[in-house]
Amino acid sequence: MMLSSTSLYAAIDLGSNSFHMLVVREVAGSIQTLARIKRKVRLAAGLDNQNHLSQEAMERGWQCLKLFSERLQDIPLDQIRVVATATLRLASNADEFLRTATEILGCPIQVISGEEEARLIYHGVAHTTGGPEQRLVVDIGGGSTELVTGNGAQANILVSLSMGCVTWLERYFGDRHLAKENFERAELAAHEMIKPVAQRFREHGWQVCVGASGTVQALQEIMVAQGMDELITLAKLQQLKQRAIQCGKLEELEIPGLTLERALVFPSGLSILIAIFQELSIESMTLAGGALREGLVYGMLHLPVEQDIRRRTLRNLQRRYLLDTEQAKRVSCLADNFFLQVEKEWHLDGRCREFLQNACLIHEIGLSVDFKHAPQHAAYLIRNLDLPGFTPAQKLLLSALLQNQSDTIDLSLLNQQNALPADMAQHLCRLLRLAIIFSSRRRDDTLPAVRLRADNNALYVLVPQGWLEQHPYRAEALEQESHWQSYVQWPLLLEELS
């Protein structure tokens, strides 16, 4: 038992709104999540005007920790980290709570500063979130909000502000009314908090903004439920605020995709996020792959931050599912060659090129389940696996491409994903399918010099003179492919160069 437990790690975050526990296993330099346990303790709601933590709030916290403690018993002490954040930084009687909490858990609890919290959040994001290196990270907690800019693994500006979705709920939505005036007061107060640091952030700049909190997670769930793309914008936030105001009362707040669990602190979190967007002139935000707890875990593992998280994830998949990496590379190189030949005519961009490469590198993952229905197995795996660096919308696009890699084409899958415009996703699908057919001999010396020419939606495939006659298997596959593509109004025309 002890042998397997040495690869287990746990991170616990005693937050102002929720207590969280993450249990992972180290597998070949990456982490596999074994358990995520979250309990709404709402510790911050137990603070009075003198910052004294009520007995009831402490009891709620201790009850939760009793639950956590059993799960910790099989994990070595030096592979557990427990941190406490805003409320326990603030509470005048925090020592009383921490004394009992330490006895329950049987391991030390560290009350971390706002700056250290911001650093750990950034570290968690850097290990789990793909995209450009230069980023702004926003995390709205129950009692504090962290803003961090950084480049790759290095955090630059770290700020922790004393405002959170629980404290703002008690202060500005205490009457449980979702009135316009309550939102205005909450937003104004948030503006006042952010103003002193806003210019510093704006001057520093960033390429991408990611949100790492329950508020942002809730927004993502709302957008998925309503069939929107996953980019969070100020216009969408204002739209949701109007919807909340129409509901009138917190108890009657109903927005498709918003869970009951998240509803209570959603309006207060939304107010803070609107103010952050306005003060920092944020154009759009996406959801981060991880935050504080992931930062704690990766810190214990001492794993380096990869330059390209998505590539690391794909390499791990290739190893885990014993994929033929030579074949994946062969298909990938050919698909890239095809891409470069049609990118101008089809107005494809760098994002498209990366998605096509990613799909090629794992296109045979379904074979690890069974040859029969391999594309469906591949799509299922990609939809359901934890893929650090990939957002839910990106996973949906990848699974749509993999499900459509051969045989019948299901256009609805390509049209319903939101990571790329539908026509771009369709173009990538066509290139992937052709690259797979031409590479089917699994040898580099059998790849012909194929030329592609796109004319609107028509795709001309030009092969050397006599090639089709010399390669009857692939000639037949290409003939069948032209039929598959014609069924969805994708004209595919085969020609031999004279």
From Swiss-Prot:
Assigned keywords, A-Z: Hydrolase
Disulfide bonds: none
GO biological process: guanosine pentaphosphate catabolic process; guanosine tetraphosphate biosynthetic process; nucleobase-containing small molecule interconversion
Catalytic reactions on record: guanosine 3'-diphosphate 5'-triphosphate + H2O = guanosine 3',5'-bis(diphosphate) + phosphate + H(+)
EC number per UniProt: 3.6.1.40
Pfam families xrefs: Ppx-GppA, Ppx-GppA_III
Single GO MF descriptor: guanosine-5'-triphosphate,3'-diphosphate diphosphatase activity
Pathway(s) annotated for this protein in UniProt: Purine metabolism; ppGpp biosynthesis; ppGpp from GTP: step 2/2
Family named by the database record: Belongs to the GppA/Ppx family. GppA subfamily.
Protein role: Catalyzes the conversion of pppGpp to ppGpp. Guanosine pentaphosphate (pppGpp) is a cytoplasmic signaling molecule which together with ppGpp controls the 'stringent response', an adaptive process that allows bacteria to respond to amino acid starvation, resulting in the coordinated regulation of numerous cellular activities.
The name this protein goes by in its record: Guanosine-5'-triphosphate,3'-diphosphate pyrophosphatase
Lineage: Bacteria, Pseudomonadati, Pseudomonadota, Gammaproteobacteria, Enterobacterales
Gene behind the chain: gppA
